[in-house]
Amino acid sequence: STGFLKMLTLCKHLRDLQFDIVLDPFETMPSFKHSLILSSLKDSYILGFDQWYKRYYSFYHPHDECLKEHMSTRATEILKHIYGEGEFSTDYDLHLPVDVEDKIKEFIGDTRIVIINPLGAKKICRLTFEQIKVIYQEMKLHFENYRVIFTGLPQDLLTIPIPEIETLPFNEFIYTVALTKYSDFVISVDTALVHIAAAYHKPTLAFYPNSRTPEYPSHLIWSPNNHKSIQIVSPTFT
């Protein structure tokens, strides 16, 4: 298939490169493509955490093999492996271009902002239209002096059956990041936006699907990591 040919081309390219260190920090289900990529990096030092791929690693780290901790704790282990024992900050650090920030500041002016991100890229990370309507009505009722701005893929936002909702006039995701920085409250089903809100210490209501398997509790590993957040986990993974 075309996808497999592209994978072989990528592997050939990787064999010609030399990296000081390669990180394989996440657990996955066994994947032949993943194995191909790792085997193509045999001349590089690979620090990995997934026991399925021990044979490809220069060093296998057994941190949190039972997956009971937040992923940020793994970042600490990576830093210790590279730099030795010490105190490390795992706070998120997001760079924003000045022109992007300026456009967002001009867009919001002196208004206060509530962000609603109701439709994630994955089908399991989506609110129903009825849920969206209820949340929107509650925001308009209790945050009457705030602008409620919907973010997400433009084609998805067009499907929301609420007349005249406000969205960003910019398509690039970096503007959503900037809007989050200057917002007052974030409601999101999208894990990326939840963690962006955490970077800026924004009060957040985060909706997560339950994990498909108890062996990989994604709602725990990728929880908001923000003391100003409330996490709601679905009773099912749909």
Give residue spans per PLM region:
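Catalytic machinery of carbohydrate-active enzymes
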Residues: 1-238
